[in-house]
């Protein structure tokens, strides 16, 4: 229930909504302020981005239709998928397929009617996830996943920026 309460208090969307018990305040030997009581406040707060979330997206996600499609798609194209050894080959493979068209047909066959307006709003999120989960099923594994999910994952994008800035 804590996660639902945090969501309802907007803690996923604004750092200003997160309140700490100051009686549990502690300063580390390195001079950082931390608070007891459980949980960790990250040094960098990235608000949750729900702009691509619609009722249609929630339905295909919560019924596992999106993930099941990627497994079915991978199985139907197993020989091609197993031959993918680079990100360039993965992009070439995806260029040959209209994933959104195939996915919406699959979703409809599995009881999720397509809402064209909501699909337009959620399209980039859905497409990135389709590509990511299919990419994970290639011999590249997680590299195929993260290469594709990066397009819509603001936390991952910021992490890359922070890591690169610390290497300088």
In which residue ranges do the predicted regions lie?
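Conserved functional hotspot residues or short segments at active or partner-binding sites
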Residues: 1-168
């Amino acid at each position: 229930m804590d996660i639902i309460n945090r969501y309802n208090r907007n803690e996923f969307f604004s750092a200003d909504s997160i309140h700490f018990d100051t009686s549990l305040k502690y300063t580390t030997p390195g001079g950082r302020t931390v608070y007891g009581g459980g949980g960790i406040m990250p040094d960098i707060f990235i608000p949750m981005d729900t702009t691509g979330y619609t009722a249609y997206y929630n339905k295909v996600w919560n019924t596992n239709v999106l993930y099941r499609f990627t497994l079915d798609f991978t199985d139907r194209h197993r020989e091609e998928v197993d031959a993918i050894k680079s990100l360039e080959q993965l992009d070439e493979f995806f260029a040959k397929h209209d994933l959104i068209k195939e996915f919406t047909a699959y979703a409809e066959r599995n009881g999720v009617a397509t809402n064209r307006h909501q699909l337009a709003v959620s399209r980039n999120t859905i497409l990135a996830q389709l590509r990511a989960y299919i990419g994970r099923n290639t011999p590249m594994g997680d590299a195929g996943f993260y290469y594709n999910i990066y397009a819509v994952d603001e936390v991952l994008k910021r992490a890359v920026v922070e890591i690169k800035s610390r290497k300088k």
